[in-house]
Amino acid sequence: MKNLVRLLAVIALIIGSFWGKVPAQALNLTSIALPSLPVAVLNAADAKLTTEFGAKIDLNNSDIRDFRDLRGFYPNLAGKIIKNAPYEEVEDVLNIPGLSDTQKERLQANLEKFTVTEPSKEFIEGDDRFNPGVY
């Protein structure tokens, strides 16, 4: 008798699992959504990246990580450059107090890789120039 009850329970479970299953249906949102045209939106940071700032290291707006590609700059010399900003001209970076002769030579050799633009709050607010939070 126990075996018969077990057999009927197993058969009921098997039939119930196939019969009671209803496939999920996804909602078609394409008919509900309003058609929209793509719009190019530029904020102040994106607009600045289209200038020379996007191609060179901006001494007034770049963060410390931007100097990693330059040999001998990261982190000490880059930190001095950032601490003494803003600059009026690229050559002003050579007048930073406390630079060694080696550091001045490195700066002189890489002046063409730098640019100077007006400081933008999008890039320099909140001391993000030392730790931009990119990990």
From Swiss-Prot:
Query: Is Calcium one of the keywords UniProt gives this record?
Result: no
**GO-annotated biological processes:** photosynthesis; photosystem II stabilization
UniProt keyword list: Electron transport, Membrane, Photosynthesis, Photosystem II, Signal, Thylakoid, Transport
InterPro entries, sorted:
PSII_PsbU (IPR010527)
Q: How does it sit in the membrane?
A: Peripheral membrane protein
Extract the signal peptide range: 1-26
The compartments listed are: Cellular thylakoid membrane
Q: Is Membrane a UniProt keyword of this protein? A: yes
**What are the record's GO terms for cellular component?**
extrinsic component of membrane; photosystem II oxygen evolving complex; plasma membrane-derived thylakoid membrane
Q: What is its main location?
A: membrane
**Quaternary structure (record):** PSII is composed of 1 copy each of membrane proteins PsbA, PsbB, PsbC, PsbD, PsbE, PsbF, PsbH, PsbI, PsbJ, PsbK, PsbL, PsbM, PsbT, PsbX, PsbY, PsbZ, Psb30/Ycf12, peripheral proteins PsbO, CyanoQ (PsbQ), PsbU, PsbV and a large number of cofactors. It forms dimeric complexes.
Question: What the protein does?
Answer: One of the extrinsic, lumenal subunits of photosystem II (PSII). PSII is a light-driven water plastoquinone oxidoreductase, using light energy to abstract electrons from H(2)O, generating a proton gradient subsequently used for ATP formation. The extrinsic proteins stabilize the structure of photosystem II oxygen-evolving complex (OEC), the ion environment of oxygen evolution and protect the OEC against heat-induced inactivation.
> Which family does the UniProt entry place this protein in?
Belongs to the PsbU family.
Instruction: Report the protein name in the record.
Output: Photosystem II extrinsic protein U
Q: What is the lineage of its organism?
A: Bacteria, Bacillati, Cyanobacteriota, Cyanophyceae, Oscillatoriophycideae
